[in-house]
Structures are given as structure tokens and as C-alpha cells.
Amino acid sequence: MRLAVVRHAESVENADKYNGFYQDPRPWTGAAAHALSRDVIGLTARGFRQTAWLGETLPQVVGDGPAVFVSQYRRARDTAELAMPGITAEVTGLLNEQHYADATYMTMRELFETFPDGADDRRHRKHLWTPPGKGGESLAVEVHGRVTAFLALLAPGAVEAGRSAVAFTHHTTILGLRAVLEQRPVTEVVEESRARKLPNAAVLVYRVAAGRYELEQVIEPPA
């Protein structure tokens, strides 16, 4: 049995985040910015091409009829639907991107000026930083807890039945998943990501045996 963890294909935010999404001052409320990120942001033309590549690649990894899970965000749902047509994915908030709450799409300058109390954590301990506002999540606590819950739910339905699974999710959520799946400190995974960020549409393939996950390979889309 294998678990394929997939970062969503390239979104319009990934391609052009500093030319429109991050404005100073931010033109939206925190709630509106979060809704924009969750419900509106779709894929670029390159992202659509990446989903075609995923459609060819994933069956070679997980075979036919895997269990498919996807976050509630549009860019992840679009990736799953285009990459695996004909398979109904289970949409789950457990795979959502880190919730940045009132900090969503704020520049660093505006963030530190508006919410100075959390500035040190954001600068030096980002994995511990809890974004201000309702629903704000830290990587080390809330995101880590969510992905742990996802894997606990996955175990009886797929792992124990020997059925492969695919999880379409997001950059920061994948950091949490890697920490749990590979039994590594969050700080180590974060530092590794700073050196080289996992590209959009990349696939982490884990072999599952006796309830343990072993990273088998990382497959990246064509440049």
C-alpha cells in the first residue's frame, strides 16, 4: 500500500503573489482575504498542464481505485478533479492549508505594525507563530494536530485494508505531514524546506507497512 501526498498544481497566487495579492495596505479584511484564498484562487495554465502530468503519473504510483482525499481549498480541489477524473475525492478540512486568519495576505511591514506582539515568533520561530485572529493556526500545534488526525482516520479505512491513498494538499500542511510520517522534528522539516521548497504538483510517495510510513520517492513535474 502506498500513500501519495500531492502539493496542489500551480495557482495564480503561486505565480504572481507579490503583484496583487500582497498589497500594502491590504485592501481586504482578514476574513475576506481568507475567503479569497480558500474559495477563489484557481490554477494557472501551467497548473492545468501539471494536472495532466499528475493524471499520467499517479496511476503508476497508486494503481487503480485509490482512496482520494483533498483539502477544502479550490486550488487543491481543482487539482484532484483534473488529475483523477472519475474518482470522487473526500473533501476534508484536515488537509487545509495553515489558517493565517487576520494575517492573510498582509505584508510583513503591515503585519508587524498591526500585530507587534507576535513579531518575534513570526521572524524567528515561524513554526510556533500563531497568526492573529479567529481560527489562526500554528504549524507546530494546530496544523500538526490536524494532519495527525487525518492519518488516524486514514489508517482503518485504507491502510488496514491495503488500499493505496492520495492526499491533495498544501505546502505548509505537507511540512506537518512530513514531520508526522517521517517522525522528524518540525523544525528540521522547516529548515529543509527553506533550503528548497517542494514545487507545485510534486508527489511524495510513502510505502506503508506494519503501520509505518517510509518515504520511497519524491516525484517532481517537468520544469
Pin down the residues of each PLM region.
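An N-terminal RHG(E/S)-centered segment typical of histidine phosphatases
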Residues: 1-65, 210-223
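Short, solvent-exposed loop/turn segments at secondary-structure junctions
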Residues: 9-12, 73-76, 96-97, 171-174, ...
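Generic structural signal for well-ordered alpha-helical scaffold segments
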Residues: 52-59, 144-156
